[in-house]
Amino acid sequence: MSRWLAAAAVLSALVAPAPALAGVLDRYAPVVVHASGEPDALTSVRAFAGRVAGVEPGPARPVVYGRRAGRWLQYWMLFAASSQDRGLVRTGRHEGDWELVQLRLRGRRAVRAVYSQHAGAESCGYRFVRKSGGRPVVYLARGSHAAYFVPGLRDRTWPDPNDEADGRGLRVRPRLVRISAGRPPWIRYRGRWGATRAGWVPGEMSSPRGPTLQPDGHWSDPGGWAAAARPCTRLDCNRRGECDGRETALAGVLAALGLLWALLFGARRMRRAQATPANGGH
């Protein structure tokens, strides 16, 4: 990957795509708000390639990579690493991290937004999306870069950690670079964006592949990916910054009680079966 990215960085510098696409793609390019203490802020492909020994780093200014796919606008964001631990053994960190913000158009007007979050996504009517200068605002969770419509704390299923998207970190309006299935050259790279490889430990993750090879049809079927997203249900948070903590915590307690009941009921039936003589036995 290092050699390929090095070549792509040089070639991209010589045959660079337009830095911004006039019109609707540029108009809706998102404003990105990091969480406080974010160790790996939004970057660019050239800056990421610069992490490889012997390759000059590109501009430090963050970039979003935009494309129009039929009635959808896609904005891809690259981060040098995902640094949020997961699971009981606290694994899950990996080099390289791609995230996606997607907008549904009706004519030239955005009507729906879909933000990627871990292995899924959240969908919301565009009129409910917070905006800055007419652009959608994206709040990133610390370490994981899961994208949210409002800042706050999200309670995730134990043992995974909560998502902290407090909106108090770096706020940027990234430069927009247009991409397609063939340009710039790095879009054709079929390897992994990073050296991390998952081992046998549960929760370990390999570095991701690029936008065109993302799972769940992100690139090839934007509408299908959006249809699978969960609808946004709460766009406000309490004074402590908790956006869904109470509901999720209650669901976790109910699930634990249900599991305990199932175990006790199963043990009771087993004892009854052991105490009952077999048919025909005298």
Task: Pin down the residues of each PLM region.
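Generic hydrophobic/packing signal
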Residues: 13, 102, 121-122, 261
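Positively charged n-region of N-terminal signal peptides that target proteins for export
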Residues: 1-4
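Selective detector of the "anchor" transmembrane alpha-helix that sits immediately C-terminal
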Residues: 247-268
